[in-house]
Amino acid sequence: MLASHFKLSSVLSPRTDEEKQYMSHVPYENAVGNLMYAMVSTRPDISHAVGVVSRFMTNPGKEHWQAVKWVLRYLRATSDRCIVFNGNSSEGSVCGYVDADYAGDLDKRRSTTGYVFTLAGGAISWMSKLKKQLHCPLLKPNI
């Protein structure tokens, strides 16, 4: 859901005292916390974006803040959208979807995987998770 032009990494974090001073007045943590609440409560569609922007909570830069504001604008523009359970739907079974961003974490080259399960057209379970470590079976030592 985060626009493809946002290539966020720790390289974009403030380096100078002036940049750090500017970002100290930005309510980044508060905004990301509000996004987390919306994600958990009613908006599973922003799970990936929230996971990405939350990686920079300790030292966010201006580009990170721009991404948070983009997600907030997305929520405002789609505030009429909601999870609907259609009782008349022919979709009486659970349906699942999965996706991954394959090394989308530009700092540590880790992937994010997510899934969503729906019933009668409405999301009933969802998750988005950053992998803890890189797994590459080709790099295992021969024993």
What would you call each of these model-derived segments?
Residues M1-I143:
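Divalent metal-binding acidic/histidine catalytic loops
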